[in-house]
């Protein structure tokens, strides 16, 4: 079948069909005269692609589906969440999604409407592309950027599927081989499709460690930042973390690499053939570059604890006092360093996900505050000065620059708790159980425009890092403001206020705020509340997969192709 016949049959333009072939979604045979010959299988694949694209599924996600890295159900759940957050905008697509599973699985498309593909063709890209990979706690993401044209070309996200069930409920571990295999498959898909990749950058979940042997192979699971073993009682009812502080005067939180290693040493859980340890992103870099010993960026090394940020070295005296100097410590750099190559593509040293997210979300590092409100919340700003603070964490960024970071345990989660409260009342009234975010958001906006004095909400449902025993409170309630809308607005102000309390007085020299995170996107009034509190303009970032984007930009800088 010729391309003109395919176009007439399924309503796709020639440009779109060739674009899908360019992206590797179809592989079309050619006749002896060089003309493409489309088979029934090609037409079926194009019908599937068109159907998925009309439902709003991205080209990169379709690629993952065809490569068997995600299931159709994975894509549908992801798309439904996207649509629910922008329900009015995507109402017609929501109807399509609801009927999609049966139609797709039975190859029933019957699409007569034409569809115009708007994605960027490879031919429009420069030869200065970079890839970023982010190994997150639940997903692995990748993004491709064109540094010359300053665009984010394509993004991919898959479930990491690496969690390992262990007997002790305080332990939280993942399989490093599963994580690396999936990350490498993503990189292979990208490098097969894009021939102008000049750099690969890596980031991922900080604090956690994986033990390695002398050959650079993992000899343990990844013990993640969510692990709570160091919070268990040690002696005299103090925790392992408490004991670290008593012996060294250094605070190392549970889930941090050295707190985990301390627990493992005392309880004989360090594998016999352990030589060193590293983060999961460092381990991926080692596998990509076929190196055997970890080189850590300072942003990652600091996340383990017991690290001298100014001197760029581990605190060996404190480590010796704890009796845990039984491994060879990784090397550390604060430079834009190329560790090695993967398929002749330079691979930069891995950086921490907080730092990568900052780089990926913020254009002007020195003038901008980043407020990220997801399940928790985090506020970050760049400083050139070295300063330590009890409520703020100082983290290395790049040479001679640091991030001052304040983190709250319950950001958007607080709003979710409120939504669950309202939904339970509605369900008890025999109405269908469904999300009530749209209704609450409308009430919050109405309350905001009224400008009344709202109830004061301290959303400490999970305590504070400095005091885990704290509880949430609601006060300043009056007859006038005790309404669902005013209460919900109080929650929004409480969430934003906790972020402001970390850095507010220090923000006078900054010019703008970049807001990111699902809560900011799902609660429209939050942008205005943040702006009111800080007295600065707020822009909600449209960047996708900010940590992966930041890793790509870091790698691009490492090879000299970053124009920013």
Please give the residue ranges for each predicted region:
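Active-site core segments that coordinate phosphate-bearing ligands/cofactors
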Residues: 131-132, 144, 238-251, 262-279, ...
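Core-facing hydrophobic residues within beta-strands of well-ordered domains
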Residues: 197, 327-329, 510
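Carbohydrate-associated surface elements
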Residues: 227
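Amphipathic, non-transmembrane alpha-helical scaffold segments
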Residues: 76, 80, 87, 180, ...
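Basic helix-turn-helix/winged-helix DNA-binding cores
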Residues: 1-64
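Short beta-strand-loop/turn "lid" adjacent to the catalytic site in phosphate-handling enzymes
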Residues: 170, 192-224, 251-255, 285-308, ...
């Amino acid at each position: 079948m010729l391309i003109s016949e395919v176009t007439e049959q399924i309503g796709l333009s020639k440009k779109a069909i060739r674009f899908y072939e360019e992206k590797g979604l179809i592989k079309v045979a050619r006749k002896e005269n060089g003309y493409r010959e489309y088979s029934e299988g090609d037409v079926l694949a194009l019908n599937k692609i068109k159907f998925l694209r009309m439902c709003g599924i991205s080209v990169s996600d379709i690629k993952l589906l065809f490569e068997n890295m995600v299931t159709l159900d994975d894509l549908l759940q992801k798309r439904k969440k996207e649509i629910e957050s922008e329900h009015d905008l995507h109402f017609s697509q929501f109807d399509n999604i609801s009927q999609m599973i049966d139609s797709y699985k039975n190859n029933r498309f019957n699409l007569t409407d034409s569809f115009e593909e708007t994605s960027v063709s490879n031919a429009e890209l420069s030869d200065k592309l970079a890839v970023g990979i982010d190994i997150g706690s639940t997903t692995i993401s990748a993004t491709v950027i064109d540094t010359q044209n300053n665009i984010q070309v394509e993004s991919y996200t898959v479930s990491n599927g690496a969690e390992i069930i262990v007997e002790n409920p305080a332990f939280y571990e993942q399989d490093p081989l599963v994580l690396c295999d999936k990350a490498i498959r993503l990189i292979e898909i990208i490098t097969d499709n894009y021939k102008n990749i000049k750099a690969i950058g890596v980031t991922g979940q900080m604090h956690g460690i994986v033990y390695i042997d002398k050959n650079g192979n993992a000899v343990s699971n990844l013990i993640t930042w969510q692990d709570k073993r160091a919070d268990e009682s040690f002696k005299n009812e103090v925790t392992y973390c408490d004991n670290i502080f008593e012996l060294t005067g250094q605070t190392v939180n549970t889930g941090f690499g050295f707190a985990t290693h301390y627990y493992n040493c005392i309880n004989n859980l360090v594998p016999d053939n352990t030589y060193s340890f590293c983060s999961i992103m460092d381990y991926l870099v080692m596998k990509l570059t076929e190196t055997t010993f970890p080189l850590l960026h300072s942003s990652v090394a600091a996340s383990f604890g017991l690290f001298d940020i100014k001197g760029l070295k581990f605190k060996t005296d404190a480590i010796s006092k704890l009796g845990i100097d039984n491994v060879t410590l990784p090397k550390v750099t604060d430079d834009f360093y190329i560790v090695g190559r993967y398929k002749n593509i330079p691979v930069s040293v891995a950086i921490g996900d907080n730092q990568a997210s900052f780089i990926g979300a913020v254009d002007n590092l020195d003038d901008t505050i980043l407020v990220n409100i997801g399940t928790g919340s985090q506020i970050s700003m760049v400083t050139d000065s070295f300063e330590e603070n009890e409520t703020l964490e100082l983290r290395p960024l790049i040479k001679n620059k640091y991030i001052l970071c304040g983190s709250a345990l319950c950001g958007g989660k607080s709003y979710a708790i409120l939504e669950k409260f309202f939904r339970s009342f509605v369900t008890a009234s025999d109405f269908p159980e469904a999300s009530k975010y749209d209704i609450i958001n409308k009430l919050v906006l109405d309350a905001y425009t009224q400008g009344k004095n709202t109830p004061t909400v301290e959303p400490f449902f999970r305590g504070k890092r400095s005091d885990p025993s704290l509880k949430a409170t609601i006060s300043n309630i009056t007859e006038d403001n005790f309404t669902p809308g005013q209460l919900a607005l109080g929650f929004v102000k409480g969430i934003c206020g906790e972020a402001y309390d970390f850095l507010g007085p220090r923000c006078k020299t900054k010019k703008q705020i970049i807001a990111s995170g699902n809560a900011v996107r799902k609660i429209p009034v939050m942008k205005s509340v943040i702006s009111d509190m800080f007295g600065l303009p707020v822009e909600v970032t449209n960047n996708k997969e900010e940590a992966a984007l930041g890793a790509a930009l870091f790698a691009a800088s490492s090879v000299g192709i970053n124009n920013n």
